[in-house]
From Swiss-Prot:
Role summary: Inhibitor of lipoprotein binding to the low density lipoprotein (LDL) receptor, LDL receptor-related protein, and very low density lipoprotein (VLDL) receptor. Associates with high density lipoproteins (HDL) and the triacylglycerol-rich lipoproteins in the plasma and makes up about 10% of the protein of the VLDL and 2% of that of HDL. Appears to interfere directly with fatty acid uptake and is also the major plasma inhibitor of cholesteryl ester transfer protein (CETP).
One GO MF term attached to the UniProt entry: phospholipase inhibitor activity
Cellular component GO terms held in the UniProt record: high-density lipoprotein particle; very-low-density lipoprotein particle
Signal peptide: 1-26
InterPro entries: ApoC-1_sf, ApoC-I
Pfam families: ApoC-I (PF04691)
Stated name of the protein: Apolipoprotein C-I
GO biological process, one term: lipoprotein metabolic process
Alphabetical UniProt keywords: Lipid transport, Secreted, Signal, Transport, VLDL
Family: Belongs to the apolipoprotein C1 family.
The keyword Transport appears for this protein: yes
Length: 88
């Protein structure tokens, strides 16, 4: 799962770093770009993490999903008990 998320993040960051400055900006040298890269990565990672957490919380709070999760849990418990009594 981490690799699944890490590869696209790495590709985006490398693309951002290689894109270079806008024409109106002075061209920074390579060392200053590389110095800012960890800060940009940290900012991008925290933003991505916040958005992912918000999406997961939103999904958890939806009523239909909560009802579905409850129904699956109850059904699984019933099947488990039935199998336990049948094969015990």
């Amino acid at each position: 799962m981490r690799l699944f998320i890490a590869l696209p993040v790495l590709i985006v960051v490398v693309a951002m770093a290689l894109e270079g400055p806008a024409p109106a900006q002075a061209a920074p040298d390579l060392s200053s770009t590389l110095e800012r890269l960890p800060d940009k990565l940290k900012e991008f990672g925290s933003t991505l993490e916040d958005k992912a957490r918000e999406a997961i919380d939103h999904i958890k709070q939806k009523e239909i999903l909560t009802k579905t999760r409850t129904w699956f849990s109850e059904t699984f418990s019933k099947v488990k008990e039935k199998l336990k009594t049948t094969f015990a």
